Design a protein with these regions (language model features):
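Alpha-helical scaffold domains
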Residues: 1-181
Length: 181
């Protein structure tokens, strides 16, 4: 797989991701070092990030959840693709209702991130989590909607019922208007 990543060709990196995923039942804890090296070394766009993280690293985390702490560390790195990786790694587990406290913690770490690719990544993670935990995700969004970037908010509520979407998207009246001024 390393040679495929080193080629710099996107199609070859996708083959590396697919091949690694086909072996996910054989992962051992020490494989995290290789996966993390790929994240830090080779991710340079959303496609390579999402292809590696959604299935391959997501499957690894499902087998070895002790590495959730590493994802929280990734969420604090200067590299935008590593920050996005911290969220999109949890898309499939989130859909399955797993790791909600960790998902919310990562979303909080990334909450004020100014990078739109990171906002879309953690918004997508929240949207996936809402499939199993709609009320919890709605409450999370509502508690943070005044500061949450609209891009992330829109992604997070995309699959919610219309009435919840409308509540989440409603802008708070300015204080002056509320005070009658």
């Amino acid at each position: 797989c390393e040679g495929l990543w080193q080629s710099g060709c996107m199609e070859e990196s996708f083959i590396a991701c697919q091949w690694a995923y086909t072996r996910h039942k054989e992962f051992v804890p020490d494989d995290f070092a290789t996966l993390e090296r790929w994240v830090h070394t080779y991710l340079s766009n959303w496609a390579s990030c999402d292809t590696l993280c959604n299935h391959t690293i997501g499957a690894f985390i499902q087998s070895y959840p002790e590495h959730l702490a590493d994802l929280k560390r990734w969420a604090r790195t200067p590299n935008r693709w590593v920050r996005r990786a911290s969220a999109v790694t949890l898309i499939i587990p989130a859909r399955q209702g797993q790791f909600l406290p960790d998902i919310l913690e990562i979303a909080d770490i990334l909450l004020m991130d100014e990078d739109d690719m990171v906002q879309k990544g953690y918004g997508w993670m929240l949207k996936a989590a809402s499939q199993a935990h709609q009320q919890e995700i709605f409450e999370f969004v509502m508690a943070r909607k005044a500061v949450m970037p609209r891009t992330a908010l829109r992604y997070a509520i995309e699959k919610m019922p219309k009435e919840l979407k409308e509540k989440a998207m409603a802008r708070e009246p300015e204080r002056r208007k509320r005070a009658g001024k």
